């Protein structure tokens, strides 16, 4: 008999965090079926209805999206978001990232009452702006069960403490596309993340700029990777979280957090006691070294970067192919005099335009996903490591570790338009800031000095 999560089961699930489209809850009950699992529940989004295509196949994708993904029959016949997400990870992402670090999850049936109860239960723990934006979509009859990668071993604990780190790496390369406008050339020398920080600061979405630069994390240099991890620890925002045995000990749940204060730093140092065998005042430093060594040694970011680089044309190029795909006149070309390069995009066969847009959206998944690294200390009497491990020289400890990619959501086709608008907003604001700074510098330099 198929299992259905009912209203009475809602109390076993606790809020873990959320993104734009999903809530994530961790299991705190005793059923062996769910110990070591999280549940991913869709949030309510307008116009999320299944559509019949010309062949009468029901799909949650729009007709343009069905055309875009037409080579993948399983994907285009997805009747709801849970099925779509699972099939996208299984059929599109796993062939690119490999099965070792990706979990497609399994679907579980849920009752309306379960979803309503969960929605009510977690409201107080959610950031207010997230609550105002969307609630649980109670019209769904299934949710996605995934392994809880904040725990080292799923199922019953193997005894040792587990510390896990969640990193949202963001885009790790500078674009070189010939479609980038002359006025936007700063995009080729400053990371998108750094530019976006200025805009977020202007709109009070963050309290200060992050010290982190994704280019360091993806650099392939051991020293730069460590710098990136230290910067993430200092200014976590929503890019860095740490869990001890599944409980959050650093970072925010579902929202951006400010700088790591001395008080938070002391509490974190204390939480590492027993896990990192070092003197007081040195545990955090050793831990950040451990994370850095695992990121560098695993090589997972190299593969992720390859997928991010499927965005070959930048949004300034891909947007033209998008309008060809949806069969609409290109408003960007209408705005000004289109360049020869842009016209050449509109002259491409439709299959080429489809490929450009599809690869751009897959790259967008890779730019927005997170990686989860779980660590467990090895004892001297443990058998030889069978999986990945890292040695921490200052403490003479060895840790087994596992790396998983999470939040590998399919981006809606319609989002191409908002990607283009946001990109324009980010670069024009950054350009204005740079000009203002240069002008202020020139004025400062031209002032006569009084000796």
From Swiss-Prot:
The modification N-acetylmethionine is found at residue 1. The gene coding for this protein might be inactivated to commercially produce plants with phytate-free grain. Indeed, while the role of phytate (InsP6) accumulation in seeds is unknown, it causes nutritional and environmental problems, partly due to the inability of monogastric animals to digest it. A motif (EXKPK motif) lies at residues 166-170. The EXKPK motif is conserved in inositol-pentakisphosphate 2-kinases of both family 1 and 2. Keywords: Acetylation, ATP-binding, Kinase, Metal-binding, Nucleotide-binding, Transferase, Zinc. Phosphorylates Ins(1,3,4,5,6)P5 at position 2 to form Ins(1,2,3,4,5,6)P6 (InsP6 or phytate). Phytate is a regulator of intracellular signaling, a highly abundant animal antinutrient, and a phosphate store in plant seeds. Also phosphorylates Ins(1,3,4,6)P4 and Ins(1,4,5,6)P4 to produce Ins(1,2,3,4,6)P5 and Ins(1,2,4,5,6)P5. It is an enzyme of class 2 (transferase). Its EC number is 2.7.1.158. Zn(2+) binds at residues 320, 330, 333, 346. Belongs to the IPK1 type 2 family. Binds 1 zinc ion per subunit. This is Inositol-pentakisphosphate 2-kinase. Its cofactor is Zn(2+). Substrate binds at residues 45, 130, 170, 200, 238, 368, 411, 415, 419. ATP binds at residues 19-22, 40, 147-149, 166-168, 241, 407. One of its GO terms (biological process) is phosphate ion homeostasis. It comes from the Eukaryota. It catalyses: 1D-myo-inositol 1,3,4,5,6-pentakisphosphate + ATP = 1D-myo-inositol hexakisphosphate + ADP + H(+). One of its GO terms (cellular component) is cytoplasm. InterPro entries: Ins_P5_2-kin (IPR009286), IP5_2-K_N_lobe (IPR043001). Strongly expressed in leaves and cauline leaves. Weakly expressed in siliques and flowers. In flower, it is expressed in the major organs of developing flower buds. Strongly expressed in sepals, petals, in the male and female organs of immature and mature flower buds. Strongly expressed in the gynoecium and carpels which are fused to form the gynoecium. Also expressed in the transmitting tissue and ovules. GO terms for molecular function: ATP binding; inositol-1,3,4,5,6-pentakisphosphate 2-kinase activity; inositol-1,3,4,6-tetrakisphosphate 2-kinase activity; inositol-1,4,5,6-tetrakisphosphate 2-kinase activity; metal ion binding.
